[in-house]
């Protein structure tokens, strides 16, 4: 479908149209008393006025709507009739409005993660019932963002509609059949005219000028550089202040490790199996029976996380696992910067750590 335009005076009308058919989620400003320093969060809205489409970045990525921090996978029990197991897959139609390209890219990667080999019905059922309306960026969120380096600044898949701000209207790229249906049924859009195409070209030009590379080498060489730096002293130095809190994993849009626990009632008659986010930065993450810990030291855990983002996920899924959103840098209490690590890898001698 050819590009469309959405006048900003009709934006609220579109959101209300969506609210009649979906749970609508979008960036909402959080007060300072709710979040230290303030910020934004993807939340379910009750009115279009709650949306802040000028937000820089949310604290948590929108992946929580497809892959919740906690969820029940199944419940089980027994009674006079025998044993029973229920494994309901809960999903409601959801429209996520205002996803930046880095989060769209991350969601596209997670789609691959959860659909390969043994597909995950819980993630995929939510994803299949989701409508993604992206919002293109024209300038970096802040000094921590390096999406240009990681290849997530420009996306051409993973969304249903992508909005580009042209001032009094949005230029709309239609990315799916579901997006086309929304354009046709809502009545809020008009075909883009020549003037709209010209202004969008100017938007793209300003975007290209507004984002500078922050890493001194092409990140296609990152896997090779990591290979050569496995025994570098950098890992000890960079991890020295790490609290092993796992905040970097919790705010990352592409981390997907989880733990599974069975919770049984005191009467042993009922129970449930729960899934929750896990973190490879926690000391217990690689601990196994008998007390052996394959990544006991903070340096080994940090190295694994960086290798995961810059090498392992690329080998498994063909995409870098870091989108350059900068969330981990922003929220690390020890101020450990993965951007600085990427940069230092190219200049730090690969000296053995002995670990």
Where are these regions (language model features)?
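Residue-level detector of anion-binding/catalytic polar loops
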Residues: 23-24, 248, 328
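Extended amphipathic alpha-helical segments enriched in small hydrophobics
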Residues: 239-249
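Iron-sulfur-associated redox domains of electron-transfer enzymes in respiratory
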Residues: 1-227
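Active-site pocket-lining segments that scaffold enzyme catalytic pockets across diverse folds
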Residues: 254
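Ferredoxin-type iron-sulfur electron-transfer modules in oxidoreductases and energy-metabolism complexes
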Residues: 219-240, 258-355
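General structural feature for long, well-ordered alpha-helical segments within catalytic domains
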Residues: 10-14, 248, 276, 337
């Amino acid at each position: 479908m050819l590009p469309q335009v959405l006048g900003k005076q009709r934006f609220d009308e579109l959101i209300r149209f969506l609210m009649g058919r979906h749970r609508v989620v979008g960036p909402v400003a959080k007060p300072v008393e709710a979040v230290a320093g303030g910020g934004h969060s993807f939340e379910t809205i009750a009115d279009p006025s709650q949306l802040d489409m000028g937000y820089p970045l949310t604290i948590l990525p929108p992946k929580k709507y497809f892959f919740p921090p906690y969820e029940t996978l199944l419940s089980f029990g027994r009674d006079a009739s025998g044993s029973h197991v229920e494994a309901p897959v809960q999903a409601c139609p959801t429209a996520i409005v205002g996803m930046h390209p880095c989060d769209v890219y991350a969601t596209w990667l997670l789609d691959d993660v959860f659909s390969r080999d043994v597909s995950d019905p819980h993630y995929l059922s939510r994803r299949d019932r989701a409508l993604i309306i992206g919002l293109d960026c024209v300038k970096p969120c802040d000094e921590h963002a390096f999406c240009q380096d990681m290849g997530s600044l420009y996306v051409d898949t993973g969304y249903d509609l992508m909005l580009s701000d042209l001032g009094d209207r949005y230029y709309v790229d239609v990315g799916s059949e579901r997006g086309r249906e929304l354009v046709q049924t809502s009545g809020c859009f008009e075909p883009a005219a020549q003037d709209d195409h010209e202004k969008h070209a100017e938007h793209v030009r300003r975007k290209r000028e507004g984002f500078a590379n922050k890493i001194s080498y092409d990140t296609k060489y990152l896997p090779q550089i990591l290979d050569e730096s496995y025994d570098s002293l950098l890992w000890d130095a960079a991890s020295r202040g790490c609290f092993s809190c796992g905040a970097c994993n919790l705010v990352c849009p592409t981390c997907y490790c989880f733990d599974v626990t069975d919770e049984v009632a005191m009467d042993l008659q009922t129970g449930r199996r729960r899934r929750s986010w896990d973190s490879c930065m926690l000391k217990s993450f690689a601990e196994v029976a008998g007390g052996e810990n394959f990544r006991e030291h903070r340096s080994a855990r940090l190295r694994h996380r960086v290798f995961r983002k810059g090498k392992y996920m690329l080998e498994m899924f063909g995409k870098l696992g870091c989108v350059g959103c900068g969330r981990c840098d922003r929220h690390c209490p020890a101020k450990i910067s993965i951007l600085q690590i990427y940069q230092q890898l190219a200049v730090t001698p690969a000296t053995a750590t002995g670990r």
